[in-house]
Amino acid sequence: MKTLLLTLVVVTIVCLDLGNSFSCYKTPYVKSEPCAPGENLCYTKSWCDRFCSIRGKVIELGCAATCPPAEPKKDITCCSTDNCNTHP
């Protein structure tokens, strides 16, 4: 009986997702961090500000439940695998 109970506990732990394991790179530190539950997309936004000619485009990386909406003069890409939004 104890063996059956232990087996059921192990199977339950294996089958349940006890934590969100999906991760994306996030700014400002450009390091991989876990996403919140329900956020299963990684995104990269890039755009030019007034310093673009000196230091290049501004980059924003993060997690999202849906791909962020298009914005004028901003490039937005989304992907759905762990850490797929590497810094361009």
Curated annotation (Swiss-Prot):
The answer on whether this UniProt entry bears the keyword Signal reads: yes
Q: Name one GO cellular component term.
A: extracellular region
**Tissues with expression:** Expressed by the venom gland.
The SS bond pairs are C24-C42, C35-C63, C48-C52, C67-C78, C79-C84
Q: Which UniProt keywords apply?
A: Acetylcholine receptor inhibiting toxin, Disulfide bond, Ion channel impairing toxin, Neurotoxin, Postsynaptic neurotoxin, Secreted, Signal, Toxin
Q: Which GO terms describe its molecular function?
A: acetylcholine receptor inhibitor activity; ion channel regulator activity; toxin activity
- Where is the protein situated, by its record's location annotation? Secreted
Please list which residues make up the signal peptide.
1-21
A Pfam family matched in the record: Toxin_cobra-type
Which family does the entry's similarity section mention?
Answer: Belongs to the three-finger toxin family. Long-chain subfamily. Type II alpha-neurotoxin sub-subfamily.
- Task performed by this protein: Binds with high affinity to muscular (alpha-1/CHRNA1) and neuronal (alpha-7/CHRNA7) nicotinic acetylcholine receptor (nAChR) and inhibits acetylcholine from binding to the receptor, thereby impairing neuromuscular and neuronal transmission.
Identification of the protein by name: Long neurotoxin 20
